[in-house]
């Protein structure tokens, strides 16, 4: 029996994120802060090449192991299914778009930096609820996931805990992007 690299985009994403965290906690202590965290409002400098890169790379950075394990428990569970349905390159594009949108919105609206793949997790959760989507129908699973996950995040974000509003914001945006991909992106080999 041999081990198969069955989900190239998701596995590469997971290994890259773990590598960034290992390096950040051992020999390159400032790696995450410098290259894998998008700055907040007032900290983004358009002339800085690094700032532009972090609009995409912040999803690879994580604060610690519980943060990474929490995100990749979902990504490694849902991601391979999505990669099978949509293909490796489209899933890579979806992850990249989610990273860019959450990064840009963080720069525009929040003063704190942003790192982690939480927006990608919520994009995948909402996108996965569209696996049985057909023209003219909205899956009940999508509605339930929307109410449960995004409703919870909205409730938390409007609470008194201002320290966590940024991550809830990334969750909400990621879920919204996943919903859009679900509505407009066709699985491989299907037509609406």
Question: PLM features: what roles do these ranges have?
Answer:
Residues 1-192:
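A detector for small-residue-rich transmembrane helices and their helix-helix packing motifs
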């Amino acid at each position: 029996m041999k081990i198969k690299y069955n989900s190239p985009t998701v596995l590469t994403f997971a290994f890259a994120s773990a590598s960034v965290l290992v390096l950040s906690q051992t020999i390159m202590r400032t790696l995450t802060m410098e290259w894998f965290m998008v700055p907040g409002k007032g900290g983004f400098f358009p002339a800085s090449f690094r700032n532009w890169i972090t609009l995409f790379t912040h999803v690879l950075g994580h604060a610690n192991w519980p943060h990474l394990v929490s995100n990749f428990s979902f990504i490694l569970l849902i991601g391979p299914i999505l990669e099978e349905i949509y293909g490796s390159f489209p899933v890579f594009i979806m992850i990249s778009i989610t990273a860019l949108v959450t990064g840009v919105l963080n720069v525009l609206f929040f003063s704190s930096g942003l790192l982690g793949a939480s927006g990608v997790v919520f994009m995948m959760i909402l996108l996965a609820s569209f696996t049985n989507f057909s023209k003219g129908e909205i899956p009940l699973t999508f509605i339930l996931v929307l109410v449960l996950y995004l409703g919870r995040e909205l409730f938390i974000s409007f609470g008194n805990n201002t320290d966590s509003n940024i991550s809830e914001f990334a969750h909400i945006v990621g879920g919204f992007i996943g919903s859009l991909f679900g509505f407009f992106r066709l699985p491989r080999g299907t037509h609406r």
